[in-house]
């Protein structure tokens, strides 16, 4: 006789989280391993947590790629790496004027946070000064929150960015520590954690997440969420691998839409009070179930990513309105 598996009470687990009871790693794994027929129940439960902390608000972020390609690191997922053969645009730093223009485009797209991103291992002091000049002008002329993602930082650079008015610094953990050597050999997992800590020590809000679907196990996928909890990331971008042709991970099997939804729900259960953003791979991996993702996440990027295209801002605005949600402008 076939044994009937007992279903979890996902709503009860959600209400436990609302009452500030932390879920276990076993609970997180159970979400990821749940039968696909349970995914709507899981997302409904995740929404209980999301609504408790964020209501119906959705935060919009916009990226500007201020320096593309030319990166000496060998991250296997990245089309900007020196080892990548992907046909992308490659250029040195945009002018401060272009960076400031991008901020005004972010406002037109109804974004509250503007993300200044540059490829490379770490910025020079001259490059940090270049960014600071743009940041100061943006701060003087807009109400945007500013996030930077410039690579590894030292204490002095982090302090100067904070003093200039940078609100948030992004440096993703990318994958589980056990999986890191298979993704990159030119720096370590601990190097990435160190930069997150330096930003936080400087008084900058830490943003750190991962790219799911790079060969990590289900258990490691859950442990990533708890590691992000441990380092106290305020904002958690959940990226889903796009196996770009010309990168070492070309051909890697990408996550299904349902697998992506389970990741988002699990992340909300583990990090209930944090901004969880559906990031790279949203349109490609989630496809027609993108709106369901916002029942767990409360943030998205609007417009294009670093080297891959996003959907039109009007499509994102429409998706948010159709859900009965509201855009939260100029909020970190």
Curated annotation (Swiss-Prot):
Coiled coil: none
Gene that encodes it: bioB
Family classification: Belongs to the radical SAM superfamily. Biotin synthase family.
UniProt xrefs under PANTHER family: BIOTIN SYNTHASE, BIOTIN SYNTHASE, MITOCHONDRIAL
EC top class named in words: transferase
Free-text remark on how the cofactor is bound: Binds 1 [4Fe-4S] cluster. The cluster is coordinated with 3 cysteines and an exchangeable S-adenosyl-L-methionine.
A biological process term (GO) from this entry: biotin biosynthetic process
Record: residues binding [4Fe-4S] cluster: 71, 75, 78
Catalytic activity from the UniProt record: (4R,5S)-dethiobiotin + (sulfur carrier)-SH + 2 reduced [2Fe-2S]-[ferredoxin] + 2 S-adenosyl-L-methionine = (sulfur carrier)-H + biotin + 2 5'-deoxyadenosine + 2 L-methionine + 2 oxidized [2Fe-2S]-[ferredoxin]
Transmembrane parts of this sequence: none
Function: Catalyzes the conversion of dethiobiotin (DTB) to biotin by the insertion of a sulfur atom into dethiobiotin via a radical-based mechanism.
Pathway terms, separated by semicolons: Cofactor biosynthesis; biotin biosynthesis; biotin from 7,8-diaminononanoate: step 2/2
Record's protein name: Biotin synthase
